């Protein structure tokens, strides 16, 4: 399996910059003051550079919501019990979750991926079964996952990206479901970005002050216990991550290898993206960070990564909800690029120089 991961990493190339001048020339020729559509122009340019399609069609969209349970939930770091994870998966499978509503709204197909839920599901439409294990181990007392388990989860995510590419999807989105998963995500940020735990630990599902202080202590203990395992991004992911986070890492790596842009959801999904970027820095060329989460610390993470989220709506749900909303902006940007008239073709006078 290690060889498969090495092959995957080697397949990822930076976005082809040779089209940049032609893209910019077309954007500047559109019937508007140059640069006046701001981020929409940047989004169109990034999408075209990533895919290499100078005349991009509107992409077929797919969101994968990865689900997993966490041993660290036993430490009491969440306001909700762990059994909520499978309950929410069932809610998604029945079409009643926020991500169901928003994915339908934006015309994205939704797949719910069981990569580590502490429950066995019967086969169902839109459910992808690739369980590595029924929940991670408690990272406060040892590694959350073994190296083999981490590899399995990464490669499962990558395989889903490959399947999406083969099925003609041109824009992918990440989502997640896992009670207590802000705890491993925060630990990953603290170690991989050298950020202080206390400054980036948030309330997750709505914990009170006492539980927040306890959560900070649990994360600090987990980092100390696993210090020797955190020499590499992969080792850090195994020690402090979770199955759904590892699968998101693999999903992003697989998409980048196939030159498919990915819209990254919020606080949890960004931790999977961070690991992917630490493994192959050029992965960032294929990523749209959908929104600035209301979860404490996400702003510091975005700043440390040098990226600008597309939206700021005080979202803190996860599931892929922010990714779904941001997909509409990608569509809008490509429509602007494809459908606006040009000065050279519409007989509109350009700016007077001087």
UniProtKB/Swiss-Prot annotation:
It catalyses: 5,6-dimethylbenzimidazole + nicotinate beta-D-ribonucleotide = alpha-ribazole 5'-phosphate + nicotinate + H(+). Its EC number is 2.4.2.21. InterPro entries: Nict_dMeBzImd_PRibTrfase, Nict_dMeBzImd_PRibTrfase_bact, Nict_dMeBzImd_PRibTrfase_N, Nict_dMeBzImd_PRibTrfase_sf. Catalyzes the synthesis of alpha-ribazole-5'-phosphate from nicotinate mononucleotide (NAMN) and 5,6-dimethylbenzimidazole (DMB). It is an enzyme of class 2 (transferase). This is Nicotinate-nucleotide--dimethylbenzimidazole phosphoribosyltransferase. GO terms for molecular function: nicotinate-nucleotide-dimethylbenzimidazole phosphoribosyltransferase activity. Pathway: Nucleoside biosynthesis; alpha-ribazole biosynthesis; alpha-ribazole from 5,6-dimethylbenzimidazole: step 1/2. It comes from Chlorobium chlorochromatii (strain CaD3). Coiled coil: none annotated. Belongs to the CobT family. HAMAP family: CobT. Pfam families: DBI_PRT. The active site is at residue 319. One of its GO terms (biological process) is cobalamin biosynthetic process. It comes from the Bacteria. Keywords: Cobalamin biosynthesis, Glycosyltransferase, Transferase.
């Amino acid at each position: 399996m290690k060889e498969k991961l090495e092959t995957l990493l080697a397949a990822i190339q930076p976005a082809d910059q040779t089209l940049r001048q032609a893209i910019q020339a077309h954007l500047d020729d559109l019937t508007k003051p140059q640069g006046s559509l701001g981020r929409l122009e940047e989004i169109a340019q990034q999408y075209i550079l990533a895919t290499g399609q100078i005349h991009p069609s509107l992409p077929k969209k797919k969101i994968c919501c990865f689900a997993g349970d966490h041993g660290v939930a036993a430490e009491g770091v969440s306001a909700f019990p762990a059994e909520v994870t499978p309950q929410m998966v069932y809610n998604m499978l029945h079409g009643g979750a926020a991500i169901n509503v928003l994915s339908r709204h934006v015309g994205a197909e939704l797949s719910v991926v069981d990569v580590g839920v502490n429950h066995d599901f019967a086969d169902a439409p839109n459910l992808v079964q690739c369980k590595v294990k029924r929940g991670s181990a408690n990272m406060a007392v040892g590694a959350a996952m073994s190296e083999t388990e981490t590899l399995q989860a990464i490669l499962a995510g990558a395989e889903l990206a490959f399947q999406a590419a083969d099925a003609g999807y041109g824009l992918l989105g990440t989502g997640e479901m896992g009670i207590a998963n802000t705890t491993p995500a925060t630990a990953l940020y603290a170690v991989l970005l050298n950020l202080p735990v206390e400054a980036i630990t948030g309330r997750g599902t709505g914990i009170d002050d006492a539980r927040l202080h306890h959560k900070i202590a649990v994360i600090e203990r987990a980092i100390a216990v696993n210090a020797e395992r955190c020499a590499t991004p992969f080792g850090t992911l195994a020690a402090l991550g979770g199955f759904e986070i590892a699968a998101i890492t693999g999903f992003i790596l697989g998409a980048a290898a196939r030159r498919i842009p990915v819209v990254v959801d919020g606080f949890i999904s960004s931790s999977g993206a961070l690991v992917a970027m630490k493994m192959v820095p050029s992965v960032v060329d294929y990523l749209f960070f959908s929104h600035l989460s209301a979860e404490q610390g996400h702003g510091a993470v975005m700043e440390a990564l040098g990226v600008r989220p597309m939206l700021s709506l005080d979202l803190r749900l996860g599931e892929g909800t922010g990714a779904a909303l941001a997909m509409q902006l990608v569509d809008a940007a490509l429509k602007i690029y494809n459908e606006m008239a040009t000065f050279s073709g519409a007989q509109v006078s350009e700016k007077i120089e001087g």
